[in-house]
Amino acid sequence: MWGPPGVAGGPRERTMTNRAPALFVGHGSPMNAIEDTPSARGWAEIAQRFEKPNAIVMVSAHWVTEGVKVTSNAHPRTIHDFGRGFPQALFDVQYPAPGDPDLARALVEKLTAFGAELDDTWGLDHGTWSVVKHMYPDADVPIVQVSLDIRRPASEHYAIAHALADLREDNILVIGSGNIVHNLPAFFRAPSPDPQAWVATYDELIVSGVANDHTKVVNYTAQPDAAIAAPDWEHFTPVIYALGARHDGETPYFFNRHYYPGISMTAFAYGLPQ
């Protein structure tokens, strides 16, 4: 087992009584980090449904690289990766969760077939901290991020996710953070606050696939309305990571079924304690 963050080989106190879940969260606007929104409340509530994890492995839409990278920092920085149009209060947010260099090294070994490498330049982007600050406000759960390799098709992302699945047996929470429906031009140009019909239609199609037909999800670009509902591959692909980290026999629990113009906030969990 991995040692405490930054201490190679040291024993980590194990708190595991249950296999950690695999989650997908629709993270939406960075403002969810500092506002009392239905989605933020949903993230806080879902964290109460299972034991606090020993660590989190996060795949965020906001870290795209050539090659698979794994954060190795003992103390990852809080990255404010959004424009200056947001309020200063958002730039003031710090989420000082520790990293876990030992877990990072183990992940690189586990993902050898995919050419994974350690990276000490990245930190925690807003696809990560805007969500987990509601789940674990004390910032006391170590986090390691795994990047999205821009060179790989969806089927290979699914294979990478499958390689991460057994981490859950060590009470390590696997999270994909993106959005099933993510079309920012459609959000900004919407004539009203009501979501377009295709937002719910496409979201419901993918929800059905998450529950019953993973092939439909992995082949998401071939589904009706994909070109308008899911034009941003990096926001959809984290769905595939939660999907691939599922264990046989697990059924999804859906929450945060909120729709906005061009955006769905749907989230789901596999493996919640019964």
PLM region spans:
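Surface-exposed, charge/polar-rich loops and edge strands
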Residues: 109, 113, 141-143, 150-152, ...
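Internal, conserved structured core segments that host functional sites
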Residues: 104-156
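Beta-strand elements within well-structured catalytic alpha/beta cores of enzymes
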Residues: 21-25, 55-60, 146, 167-180, ...
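Flexible, glycine/proline-enriched loop segments at strand-loop-helix junctions
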Residues: 90-98, 120, 147-154, 226
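Short, Lys/Arg-enriched N-terminal segments with co-localized hydrophobic residues
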Residues: 6-15
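A short aromatic-anchored loop/beta-hairpin motif
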Residues: 14-114
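Short, basic/glycine-rich phosphate-binding loops at helix/coil junctions
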Residues: 23-24, 82-88, 136-144, 216-218
